[in-house]
Swiss-Prot record:
This is HTH-type transcriptional activator CsvR. SMART domains: HTH_ARAC (SM00342). Residues 183-204, 230-253 bind DNA. Keywords: Activator, DNA-binding, Plasmid, Transcription, Transcription regulation. GO terms for molecular function: DNA-binding transcription factor activity; sequence-specific DNA binding. It comes from Escherichia coli.
């Protein structure tokens, strides 16, 4: 992710945002512009946005009320995604999907307006965010009330597929404080470094990209928790110098950790 901070404090531009978990956004307090390749989607206030895992997007966020958070985000962990996908397959079924097929933006990023009924379901989901079973039930009900939900179901199915990149990221994220190298990853998978490199290249990525994305994404989430000092976050993601972490964060996102936190913290 590459964040560009503007002098207009209600506006932030973010490039190269990699969606590591299937994400549902509710634009409760913002207008959200999403760019995916040459395509652009504008999501006004009070809309739901479904983001497929693995997409790389750029966004422009403009708050309506400066003191509040711009949106509500639901990020589905592996367990929730798996159970949700299995249940939806039983309810709706699904014709054979080719994971290698070229799929356009309309099948990876979907939006819908939120009426009063959907808003009530969203509130229920917020109340059950720490209860997987109740959260999944509420989410299934929400999806059932969305017209033309077949693309959402297909996207959830695609997001449940595990690629080699996911396996490498999973190993790294178990201990981001470790000084990871390609050689260590090769030992974990009991293969050569060349094999690791080629398999990642076949998925259009490399070890350094995965490591940096994992560290910076975790740092951003830790900042939003507002529970740790900069020096603590730096150590937690494997960077020993706090000042170096600030420089890397600023280079990667385009804003300092403080600017990032202040924009997203809300009232």
């Amino acid at each position: 992710m590459d964040f560009k901070y503007t002098e207009e404090k209600e506006l932030i531009k973010i490039n190269n945002v990699m969606i590591h978990k299937y994400t549902i956004l509710y634009t409760s307090n913002c207008i959200l512009d999403i760019s995916f390749g040459e395509d652009k989607i504008t999501c006004f206030n009070n809309r739901l946005v479904f983001l497929e895992r693995g997409v790389n997007i750029s966004v422009r966020i403009q708050k309506q009320k400066l003191t509040e958070k711009p949106y509500v985000a639901f990020r589905l962990n592996e367990n929730v995604l798996r159970h949700l996908k299995n249940t939806l397959m039983i309810i709706y079924g699904m014709s054979k999907i080719d994971s290698c097929e070229c799929r356009g933006v309309s099948r990876k990023i979907m939006t819908t307006e939120v009426d009063k009924m959907l808003l009530n379901v969203l509130r229920e989901m917020m109340g059950h965010h720490n209860d997987d079973s109740s959260f999944i039930s509420a989410l299934i009900y929400l999806i059932s009330k969305i017209k033309c939900n077949d693309k959402i179901i297909e996207s959830l199915y695609m997001s449940s597929i595990t690629f080699f990149t996911d396996k490498v990221r999973g190993v790294i994220e178990k201990d981001l404080s470790r000084k990871w190298t390609l050689a260590i990853i090769a030992d974990v998978f009991n293969v050569s470094e060349i094999t690791i490199r080629k398999r990642l290249e076949s998925e259009d990525t490399n070890f350094n990209q995965i490591l940096m994305q994992s560290r910076m994404s975790k740092a951003a989430l830790l900042l939003l928790e507002n529970s740790y000092q900069i020096s603590q976050i730096s150590n937690m993601i494997g960077i020993s110098s706090a000042s170096y972490f600030i420089r890397i964060f600023n280079k990667h996102f385009g804003v300092t950790p403080k600017q990032f936190f202040n924009y997203f913290k809300g009232g």
